[in-house]
């Protein structure tokens, strides 16, 4: 368990560093290019995560646990060597040390976006992490393989949507579009809750609703990932992104814990209603995001980048 925890910390540090680097290698006035590469990086990461579910199962089946671990360690070692050879050592290094408290006192936009992110990801995991698998097993009689395959396929699709989110969102990523897609999630989750409460095709509601939820959620997540870079100074981008992902991790932890409790109290319906509350909280926080032209990306600019 300790090694698993350290692995998770290393993964988040790698994710934070990679997204911070995008801000540093893209010119400051190339908003469309920044959105495009953030979307590609975020989407490919989640798509590979979904593929990893399938590969993990295959490696366990074909090679066994110990050999599978050696194989993964070898792949990570090759990546480490590539980073040492190809990446400059001063990329993203701050000019001066910054105290943690500075983020809270001098970055209101980042604080607000991080708060919205906390409740957004908490809302997803409240019904996705524990409630959904239990619903599929107890109500639809799915086995472990079916549940794992469905959720892995969902993660892959989610990542693919993130990768092309600039085209889907018409190259429009700003605080207003973030609030709009959040509102769409609120409406969808409310409709799903009502359908299940009325016992109207609950299985179809959950399976179809999850696909639509993933599509909208992927767009919202990509816009958030873009906005955190827009709101960050180049010199402190890694620090700001790290704080933002701390909120992301906190939301996921809260969502995971609440998911099991909510399902025990009232099944998938109570999970959805609790998620709905988190989405509303995220939307209310997002109302305070700065109103500006930042993030309005002309379509023609993307082609020139």
Show which residues each predicted segment covers.
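Cytoplasmic helix-loop-helix junction between adjacent transmembrane helices
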Residues: 2-45
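Loop-to-transmembrane helix entry/capping segments in MFS-fold secondary transporters
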Residues: 29-41, 144, 232-244
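Helix-to-loop junctions at the C-terminal end of transmembrane segments
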Residues: 60, 160-177, 263
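Symmetry-related core transmembrane helices of the 12-TM Major Facilitator Superfamily/SLC fold
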Residues: 67-85, 270-288
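Juxtamembrane intracellular "pre-TM" segments in multi-pass secondary transporters
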Residues: 86-123, 138, 305
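Short amphipathic helix-loop junctions that connect adjacent transmembrane helices
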Residues: 130-147
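C-terminal transmembrane helical hairpin of 12-TM major facilitator-type secondary transporters
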Residues: 175-224
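A late C-terminal transmembrane helix in Major Facilitator Superfamily
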Residues: 235-264
